[in-house]
Amino acid sequence: MSRLAAAVRSPLVRVRASSAEARPSRRAFAPLRRVPTAAWVCALIALLNAATWSLIVPPFEGKDESDHFAYVEQIVENGSLPENGQQNGNYSNQEDLVLAGLHADEVIHSPQHTSISSEAEQRALIEANHAGASLRGSGEAGIATSEPPLYYTIEAIPYLLARGNILLQLQLMRLVGALFGAMTALFTFLFLREILPRSPWAATVGALAVALQPSLAFMSGSVNPDSMLFAVAAAVFYCLARAFRRGLTARLAIALGIGIAVGFLTKLNFVGFAFGAYVGLLVLAVREARARGRRLLLLPLLAAVIGALPVGLYALRNVLQSHHTLGLASSGGSLLAPGELWHLISYVWQFYLPRLPGMTHYFRGLATYKDIWFDRSVGLYGWMDTMFPSWVDNVALFPAALVAGLFLRGALARRKTLRRRLPELGVYAAIVLGLLVLIGGSSYDSDALNHSPAFAEPRYLLPLLPLLGAVFALAVRGAGRRWAPAAGAALIVLVFGFDVVSQLQVIARYYG
């Protein structure tokens, strides 16, 4: 009997041992299982939306797409970064042939010219795509030359998978951007659930409205580091909101630090966003020290150090190679000189708000808050050459005003709760301020000082999409209990219609 019992027990022991070994892997996926189904639905919708846009927009008609593709090509084919200090180098012969086959020079910035359509043009493009010309360029990547390398390193994977076919490479790279768009919607949902824990349905409405934004889908359906920047920014928003609501744990501090570090490695614009993120770490440090003792100051410090590591390593590398310590960012210090500071403040103010008495006129004949930031947010696609007629922008003021009114009503109804959360709201305001000042300062340097185009593109504000989702969610709650479901449904239908009409506008532009 003892032998029989041992024989029966031994398989059971092995099963228990194997299940015990499987537990760590299950624990690793436990956070994913806790994500609500609604969050995955929002992410899937954002993915499908961006993938649809990636198919609608012709090759290399995404903003600066040829430059970003050249950056990836430089990494893979030359094994180095495009950093020779020039932004006007030549693409590879193969990329030039494909661009010529697409008639890119005629189509870009020229709405009167549509994309290629005849059979002869299609055959010429196919021949150019399979010409087998050199893939080595001048070592530059146009406007993308100065950007950090992380996004482009990730895009090297689809580039290698479809090697030898630029058009297929581009499409696969666009789909990677669509995945980043899905991550943006996912983290936006999680952020809204943290700041509105008692209104999960409102969080769903806000995240869905973000997932269906045509500007997000257009940028995520293009080869552009903005797509990854939006996802990273949404993740940082979520980590900050979770820290303010539940406290900063060691795991959350590491995640927040990694998010900041990835942001620095994704795009230079994250510098402005990071200002608010570090303000958030400072506020959390003060709060945690008061509530649980100074020992917990180590957690915000840990997040800050992890986040700053890429900047420190980049500065050390440049010092060792006798470059500017912070690369292009080093030149920004001249804007803070006493003689320039007032002009900078005046320009940045007028970049977003009406001019005050005594300020120099920088935007004569323009109401920047309407003509640039609102009208171009309604629709600005392609190489800033595809937009709606002005009457559409004026009509869009009515639903925008309605959403703003409902948002204010919802905020006023919860003013006591908001007052208790002023430190957290102040951090989000610091993120907004840091990003606005960075964009405005960069535009001042380009426009006012060097007489180049201004950085007047609403896409630069899309890292703030989680806050837009919060506006939508509070607007729906502002409609009151009775009308909130109808308001939420109407909002989703409105945004979805906006997305579809925007797609039709792009189709008419390139294929009409």
Named regions from a protein language model:
Residues 77-173, 338, 370-387:
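Interfacial juxtamembrane loops and adjacent helix segments
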Residues 161, 167, 188-212:
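Transmembrane-helix signature of polytopic, membrane-embedded enzymes
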Residues 171-196, 235:
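Transmembrane-helix motifs of polytopic, lipid-linked glycan transferases
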Residues 196, 236-252, 285:
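Membrane-interface transmembrane helices that cradle and orient dolichyl/undecaprenyl
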Residues 215-229:
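Short acidic/glycine- and proline-prone juxtamembrane loop motifs at membrane-interface regions
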Residues 239, 245, 273-308, 316, ...:
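Perimembrane helix-loop-helix junctions
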Residues 252-268, 273-274, 306-309:
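Membrane-interface alpha helices of multi-pass inner-membrane proteins
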Residues 367-425, 429, 472:
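Hydrophobic, aromatic-rich transmembrane alpha-helices
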